Structures are given as structure tokens and as C-alpha cells.
Regions:
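Active-site mouth loops of central-metabolism enzymes
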Residues: 8, 97-115, 138-143, 163-167, ...
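Catalytic beta/alpha-barrel core
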Residues: 6, 145, 161-172, 182-195, ...
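N-terminal small/glycine-rich loop or linker at the start of catalytic domains
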Residues: 83-105, 134-139, 263-272
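Glycine-rich, proline-tolerant flexible connector loops at the mouths of alpha/beta enzymes
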Residues: 129-147, 305-315
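Catalytic alpha/beta core domains of metabolic enzymes, predominantly
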Residues: 203-303
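N-terminal amphipathic alpha-helix/helix-capping segment at the start of soluble metabolic enzymes
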Residues: 67-100, 337-343
């Protein structure tokens, strides 16, 4: 349950409520908002009558969350969560959509990575993405350079100022990845790796959580709940496509409807990944447009300096000239949505 305190509730009022909740075995999370202090009480509500809390000094009202993802629920927090970085970049709410671009895997050619990063920075992108540890279906496929790739990403950040997004696959690598990355990505295959979710929940880094290829929206939000429950509220959701019976023309089925559904159910920001969502280079632009129109807070796109020689996912990667053209058109569309129609990309109700 959620206890919303009065505007003029004192510190003593708040402490009295939290002490009572703790006595009855609740896990208590206190949020000090601009107007009201909100107390999340996680536990068995049958152990304590809500009427007892409601009668306490300083309590304005009590709300009960309908969905099992209590912390991620819009019922708990009506305002959009906005994740702000030290360089001023903001993800979520009515802020301009962000772009996370880069190769599927960081390769030995650092100059190629820097070429992509430099172009992305010049265009106005905010994040450089690239895999250091890659989960591959086949054991014979390239599975990443490990720490060497992380060093390349960090070096590119130094030269361009872009924030680094990279995937964490194993709890054992958490400290290593955190040393280099600005944002930790939990990939689709690990969406229900609960030990990993618990670990990233205890670190102080923003997390991009990708939807599993066969996961429902409820399962997706419950995965985010694991991260939130363990203390990390800096979660960015990512729709990246579902497995489908029809994989002849697309690698996955990109669930565009998930964006407005999640915007309604949750306060967390959500981005789209049309590269993995379709697996086809020519579909990246139209599906990115579709995602932005329905409210996505950003787009993740695979960009390679030479897709024909990419060690992984070249077929779904844009070249730098292609990305420049796509980015320019997407930016024009974003401007139109904001200025001509007075819309906000966050799809507020």
C-alpha cells in the first residue's frame, strides 16, 4: 500500500508512520516529493489495519496498488520518472527523445568505433552503445572483446562526451562493467535472470532493461520491479521485439502497442530498439517513427562504420551515411510532433 502524507506533515508524523510499519514487518520506502511525502509499504497488509494508519496525524490518504508490479505502477507514482545524467541529459517525461547508437559488438577496430561515435555526437545523439560481452545463440559466433571493448568505449566517451551503454551478462562482471559504463543494459535473454536483476538493483547506475523475446508486458514490468525493489529506481525499459511464428521477413515482431500500454501502466521511461525489433535495415526508420509517435522516450539503433564486415548483426545495422539520413528525418518528425501539434512524446493522459 501507499501512504500519502499531508502537505504540512512533520518529520515526527512521518517517523511515527514508518515506525509502525516497520514494527509490523513491512519494508518501507520513503519518497520526499515536491508537495507530499509518499511512503511505500511492502508486505502483508493483513498484519496491520489500514484504518489504524489512516487515523494517524499527518496522513492524507492510503492507496492500494492493483497490479503486482507495485513500485513500477502508475498508481504508485502518477508523474513520469525522469532519469537525469551528470551532463544534463534527461530520459523520460516530456523531454526530447534520446538516441542510443553504436555497433552490436565492439570490435578490434577502434577507429571504426570512434568514427561512429563522432558522427553520433555531431548529429546530437546522447549515448554510445556497444557490446563487450555478447550472448550468442551459437558458440561459434563472435562473443565480444570483454574488458578491451569496455576500454574502447570509455576512450570513445573521452573523445566525444557520449554516455556509454553496454550489456552486463554475469553478476561476476558487475563491478568491471560499472567501472566503465554510464548505463548498464540487461539484455532480452537475461530479463528474467533474477540474480542479475537483484545485483543491478543494488548498484547506483541507470539500467536499460530489454523485454524478453517471449515475455508478456506484466512479466516485463515485474522484471523491472525486481530492480526497483532492490533500491535502483533508474530503470529505462526497452521494447526490442518478440518471437513470432512468422520470421521469414522480420527477425522479431516489434510490439509497438507495448509503448502506450506501458505508459499507461507505469511511470518508467521506455525506448524502442527497431534494429533487434525487426532485424532488417530498411525497417529501422519506419519502426523508429512508429515508436516515437506512440510515445517512446528514445530509440536504440545499431550503427556500424561498415555493416558488410560487422562481426555481428550487420544485416540490421545502418552505415554512418544511412544513419545521418534517418536521424535527420526522425528529428524533423520529433520537431513536428512537439511544435505543430503541441504534443509531448511521453503520451501523457
Amino acid at each position: 500500500m501507499i501512504i500519502i502524507m499531508e502537505r504540512d506533515a512533520t518529520a515526527e508524523n512521518i517517523k511515527a508512520v514508518t515506525d509502525l510499519l516497520n514494527e509490523h514487518g513491512f519494508r518501507v520506502i520513503v519518497h520526499e516529493g515536491d508537495v507530499h511525502t509518499v511512503i511505500d509499504a511492502l508486505g502483508d497488509k493483513t498484519t496491520l489495519s489500514p484504518n489504524r494508519i489512516d487515523a494517524m496525524d499527518g496522513v492524507m490518504k492510503i492507496k492500494f496498488i492493483r497490479e503486482p508490479f507495485r513500485l513500477a505502477s502508475r498508481d504508485r507514482k502518477s508523474d513520469d520518472t525522469i532519469i537525469e545524467f551528470s551532463n544534463g541529459v534527461k530520459v523520460g517525461g516530456a523531454n526530447r527523445p534520446v538516441f542510443m547508437v553504436g555497433p552490436c559488438s565492439v570490435e578490434e577496430d577502434y577507429e571504426g568505433l570512434l568514427e561512429v561515435a563522432t558522427a553520433a555526437k555531431e548529429l546530437g545523439c546522447q549515448f554510445l552503445r556497444g557490446g563487450a560481452f555478447k550472448p550468442r545463440t551459437s558458440p561459434y559466433d563472435f562473443d565480444g572483446l570483454g574488458e578491451k571493448a569496455l576500454k574502447y568505449l570509455a576512450q570513445a566517451r573521452e573523445e566525444t562526451g557520449l554516455l556509454v551503454v553496454t550489456e552486463l551478462m554475469d553478476v561476476e562482471d558487475l563491478d568491471l562493467v560499472c567501472d566503465y559504463a554510464d548505463v548498464i543494459q540487461v539484455g532480452a535473454r537475461n530479463m528474467q535472470n533474477f540474480r542479475l536483476l537483484k545485483a543491478v538493483g543494488k548498484c547506483n547506475k541507470p539500467v536499460v532493461l530489454k523485454r524478453g523475446p517471449a515475455s508478456t508486458i506484466r512479466e516485463f514490468l515485474l522484471a523491472a520491479e525486481h530492480i526497483l525493489y532492490n533500491g535502483n529506481e533508474q530503470v529505462i525499459l526497452c521494447e526490442r521485439g518478440l518471437k513470432s511464428f512468422d520470421n521469414v521477413f522480420t527477425r522479431n515482431l516489434m510490439d509497438i502497442s507495448a509503448v502506450p500500454v506501458i505508459k499507461k501502466l507505469s511511470h518508467l521511461p521506455i525506448i524502442v530498439d527497431p534494429s533487434h525489433g525487426t532485424g532488417q535495415r530498411y525497417l529501422i526508420e519506419p519502426m523508429a517513427k512508429a515508436g516515437l509517435v506512440v510515445g517512446a522516450d528514445g530509440v536504440m539503433v545499431e550503427v556500424h562504420h561498415n555493416p558488410a564486415t560487422a562481426l555481428s548483426d550487420g544485416k540490421q545495422s545502418l552505415s554512418i551515411p544511412q544513419f545521418k539520413e534517418v536521424f535527420t528525418r526522425l528529428n524533423k518528425m520529433i520537431d513536428t510532433l512537439h511544435l505543430e501539434h503541441g504534443m509531448t512524446i511521453s503520451n501523457e493522459e
